[in-house]
Structure formats: C-alpha cells, structure tokens
Regions:
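Short conserved AdoMet
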Residues: 3, 38, 52
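Conserved SAM-binding strand-loop segment of SAM-dependent methyltransferases
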Residues: 4-18
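Conserved Rossmann-like nucleotide-binding pocket used by diverse enzymes
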Residues: 11, 29, 58
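A short acidic, Gly/Pro-enriched loop at the edge of an enzyme's catalytic core
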Residues: 16-28
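A short SAM/SAH-binding and catalytic strip from SAM-dependent methyltransferases
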Residues: 26-39
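Short N-terminal helix/helix-N-cap motif within the alpha/beta-hydrolase-1
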Residues: 38-42, 67
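A short glycine-rich, Lys/Arg-flanked "PGG" loop and its adjoining helix->strand segment in the class I
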Residues: 41-56
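C-terminal alpha-helical "lid/dimerization" subdomain adjacent to the S-adenosyl-L-methionine
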Residues: 58-118, 123-125
C-alpha cells in the first residue's frame, strides 16, 4: 500500500536525549529498549516529551527476572521491570490512559554456557494529555 507513503519517519538516537523538538510525534514505539537504558525513567519522560497532545507511547520490554547472565552476554543493564514501576514512570511523564499488560509471548535466549531463559514480556501504553 502507498496511502501513507512518506508519512513515517524512522530515527535512530539515544532514548534519553532524543534529538527532536517537543510535541512533534504522533506516536513513539519502542521495542526492548528500556532494559538497555541507564535511566529508563528518563527515557520514558523523553519519549513522552516529543509526543503531540493525544500522541501515543507504546513500549514492550522484559518483565522482572533473575537471569544475571544477560548483563554480560546481551548488554542488559536492568533485569526487567515490574508493571507497577513502569506504570508509575508513565504517570510521572504526564501520560494518561495508561495500561501495562503482559504480552502473550516470552523473550527466549540461551547463554554461552547453554542456560535457557524464557522471560515474560509486557506491553505498556499511554496517551499524552
């Protein structure tokens, strides 16, 4: 389909210092980025900052877990997050209509030593007020 051709722009950058002006994005979508951010709360606040009024933020990431090997082998900084903490961060970023729900799938990986992990995933959604 070409109906929306030219209306989507992809940007690569630091989630904690997005090089865009405030209120420019209709939507921000992030997949498995928070657990790699030194300050995930700041990343959420920054993503909310660039949203237009009624713009939507949708993130998926790992639920809290104990697979320490992911820090060394996958450059994870955080071992997932609790839904309550993510909801709190969305609220502090002045988002409304917040939902943090479990996804119907797992993030699976195998360590260099053969350890297997199947970690729950959440999907968090919010709307800029």
């Amino acid at each position: 389909r070409t109906a929306g051709k030219g209306r989507v722009e992809f940007k690569i950058g630091d989630a904690e210092k997005i090089p865009l002006e405030e209120g420019i994005a209709d939507a921000v979508i992030g997949n498995m980025i928070l657990h790699h951010c030194p300050q995930p709360k700041s990343a959420i606040r920054e993503m909310a900052r660039i949203l237009k009024r009624n713009g939507r933020l949708v993130l998926s990431d790992l639920e809290k877990h104990r697979e320490e090997w992911l820090k060394n082998e996958m450059a994870d900084i955080w071992l997932g997050f609790s839904p309550l903490k993510v909801k709190e961060w969305f609220r502090e970023a002045h988002l409304k209509a917040i939902e943090v729900l479990p996804a119907r799938s797992k993030c699976c990986g195998v360590s260099l030593a053969g350890r297997k992990a199947a970690i729950g995933i959440f999907i968090a959604k919010g709307v800029k007020g």
